[in-house]
Amino acid sequence: MARFPEAEARIFKKYVCLRCGATNPWGAKKCRKCGYKRLRPKAKEPRGGGR
């Protein structure tokens, strides 16, 4: 995680398209690349564990 809130907001305040994986701005209603309407917020916790 980021060390201060400004950096955390810059890194994590984004949406990710569920169809194509493109990153989109926080206020987006649909994907900028493919137009898909289902977006998820970018994950704040790592997934794999680094093994």
From Swiss-Prot:
The encoding gene: rpl40e
Matching PANTHER family: 50S RIBOSOMAL PROTEIN L40E, LARGE RIBOSOMAL SUBUNIT PROTEIN EL40
Name of this protein: Large ribosomal subunit protein eL40
Assembly notes: Part of the 50S ribosomal subunit.
InterPro entries linked to this entry: Ribosomal_eL40_arc, Ribosomal_eL40_dom, Ribosomal_eL40_sf, Ribosomal_zn-bd
HAMAP family: Ribosomal_eL40 (MF_00788)
GO MF entries: structural constituent of ribosome
Annotated GO biological process: translation
SUPFAM superfamilies in the cross-refs: Zn-binding ribosomal proteins
